[in-house]
């Protein structure tokens, strides 16, 4: 269910203050400002999970180390040479959270698959080749299991890692 400005938001606790706070305090403002759209997964009137999406792009910088060139070549491997660009269209998963009492039931994986299907369907008005995420360290294994790859090695010591999924691989 898409969050609208008049959608009531019941209590939600995924165990992460930032993710809880986004849903409670920021999601409607992001919608109003046209920065992101949040989708709720509900059982009866209880929010069990949510994710938010915004458009993004995978961009090649002009200064690349050899390792980054290798990573960028992996991104473009399935794109014909004549169609390769410096920026590829993407959708970013800005937030994804599952309430604590529903963790471990595969809801996160189902949300990732729903995002994939949303952008593989013919209902979208713009091209979108990749899904991106700035994954918390605690979620790196989750995204890895869902076939996301690291975009760079520069963020190995950061709190989040840039990751991508190629929709063409589905």
Residues of each region from the PLM?
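Conserved acyl-donor/pantetheine-binding loop and adjacent beta-alpha core of acyl/acetyltransferases
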Residues: 52-95
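A short, internal acetyl-CoA/4′-phosphopantetheine-binding micro-motif in the GNAT/acyltransferase core
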Residues: 94-104
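Conserved acetyl-CoA-binding loop-helix of GNAT-fold acetyltransferases
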Residues: 104-118
């Amino acid at each position: 269910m898409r969050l609208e400005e008049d959608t009531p938001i019941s209590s939600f606790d995924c165990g992460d203050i930032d993710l809880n706070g986004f849903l409670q305090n920021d999601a409607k403002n992001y919608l109003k400002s046209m920065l992101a759209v949040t989708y709720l997964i509900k059982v009866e009137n209880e929010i069990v999970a949510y994710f938010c999406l915004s458009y993004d792009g995978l961009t090649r910088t002009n200064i690349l180390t050899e390792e980054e060139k290798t990573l960028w070549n992996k991104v473009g491997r399935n794109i014909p040479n004549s169609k390769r660009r410096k920026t590829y269209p993407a959708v970013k998963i800005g937030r994804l959270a599952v309430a604590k009492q529903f963790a471990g039931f595969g809801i996160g994986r189902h949300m990732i698959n729903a995002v994939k299907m949303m952008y593989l369907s013919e209902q979208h008005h713009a091209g979108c080749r990749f899904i991106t995420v700035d994954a918390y360290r605690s979620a790196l294994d989750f995204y890895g299991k869902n076939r996301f790859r690291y975009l760079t090695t520069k963020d190995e010591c950061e709190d989040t890692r840039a990751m991508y999924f190629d929709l063409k691989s589905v």
